[in-house]
Amino acid sequence: MDKKKLSESDICDKFIRPAMEQAGWHGMDQIYREFPLRAGRMVVRGNKAQRDKSTVLFADYVLCLKPNIPLAVVEAKDNQHAIGAGMTQAVNYAQLLDVPFSFASNGDGFVFRDATLANGVLEQNLTAARTQQSLLAEALVKNES
């Protein structure tokens, strides 16, 4: 299978989600796909109002500690992009959710950003997704210092 020919959605389904599940994240209550971040702008015309669907904002994935307690954002890109091409978007989404951890991936690996700087490194390349326990440990290290 040529990854370069796969869509972003295919990369999510075939590579990114399985990597997160392999790292111990539970698909039913910890991995949320197309997580809504902002409902979008309301457009009013006369007596009618509706949301402008083009302004609705979704994260590709949000990893949650428990339901509705987000811990990290994962932004996916198709394999024609670099691994970290979605990092700026992931960081912006993480700021909206007020979470310290961001990932970007094109299915070949992950770029991980730790805004807590718990281990003194802001961004690093990873071959696999981080576990929930490792993210919690970094968050706790930062809170203790």
Model features per residue range: what roles?
Residues 1-145:
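ATP-dependent helicase/translocase motor core
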